[in-house]
Amino acid sequence: MNITEVMTSNVETCNLKSSCGEVANKMKSLDVGVIPICEDGKLIGLITDRDLVVNGLANNFNANTQISEMITTDVITGTKHMSVEQAADIMSQHQIRRLPIVEDGQLIGMVSLGDLAVSNASNKEAGKALEDISVPAEPTK
């Protein structure tokens, strides 16, 4: 099964000038945990609900802080040509729950572990990816 059959298209995005408050409100209204950051349609980063809490609050950022100060720019992506199984393998390998799908640098969709889990072709792969992602980190000493 091709990834385009399970990915979400027409993904809501923000840009680098968006504030933490804007992003948090968009996440809440859309009931999502990640917002892609794009400039002219090109994916330049992601911001997650965890980024807002861990990076934002820990660094005393407020709702007006631009998200450019806390986005993840080293983004693992997939392509529209990959299979659901390949996407699950990438997500498992990199321990990520969401995979942006790009074409020529442009964001064309987003796939989550939930998307993979509901596709009959990938229940096993989604379960494996979730298992790999859920391995607890070793405590720092």
Where do the protein language model's features map onto the residues?
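Tandem CBS (Bateman) regulatory domains
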Residues: 1-10, 48-77, 81-92, 112-141
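The conserved cystathionine-beta-synthase
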Residues: 13-31, 78-95, 102
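A glycine-centered beta-loop-beta connector
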Residues: 27-30, 35-51, 91, 99-114
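Short hydrophobic/aromatic-rich motifs at helix boundaries and adjacent loops
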Residues: 6, 22-26, 38-40, 58-61
